[in-house]
């Protein structure tokens, strides 16, 4: 069975109505974290719509479709109740236990832990602690979130329309 998600995990409270105005529909993960599904088309489109330019500083990423537009920083700032929101951008691409995962963790505009390579390391940095044989990934239920929601499909067409 496959596992393919790309998302932002935001630490702390956020404005749900404002988030939804950006097509960010939160899923509570526990540990004060909320998951928002995104993808590279989503981030490119919001970069265009917000008029931002540039890329986030990423480390240890070997994926050409990992979202890295500066618009993501601005979206997190806009919906978070913190002046410098903490969040991780994560990505999985597995099938039958083989594949890749990537994660970077941020405090607003700063890559907060350039050594973080895995989703578990990013989640640990955001405060997830294990209490059993489960790792951080499974403690927050990411193992049960196996694919992207259908609403993101529109961003592929929008990216073409916007030329991004």
Where are the regions that the model predicts?
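Short, extreme N-terminal segment that most often corresponds to the first beta-strand
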Residues: 1-30, 162
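Charged interaction segments
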Residues: 31, 37-164
């Amino acid at each position: 069975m496959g596992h393919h998600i790309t998302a932002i995990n935001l630490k702390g409270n956020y404005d749900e109505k404002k988030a939804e105005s950006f097509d960010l529909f939160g899923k509570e993960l526990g540990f004060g974290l909320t998951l928002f599904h995104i993808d590279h088309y989503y981030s490119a489109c919001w970069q265009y719509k917000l008029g931002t330019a540039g890329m986030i500083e990423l480390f240890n990423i070997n994926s050409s479709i990992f979202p890295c537009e500066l618009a993501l920083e601005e979206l997190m700032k806009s919906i978070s109740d913190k002046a410098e929101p903490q969040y991780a951008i994560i990505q999985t691409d597995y099938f039958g236990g083989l594949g890749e995962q990537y994660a970077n963790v941020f405090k607003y505009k700063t890559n907060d832990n350039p050594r973080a390579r895995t989703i578990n390391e990013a989640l640990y940095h955001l405060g997830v602690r294990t209490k059993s044989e489960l790792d951080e990934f499974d403690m927050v239920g990411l193992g049960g979130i196996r694919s992207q929601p259908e609403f993101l499909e529109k961003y592929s067409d929008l990216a073409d329309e916007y030329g991004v």
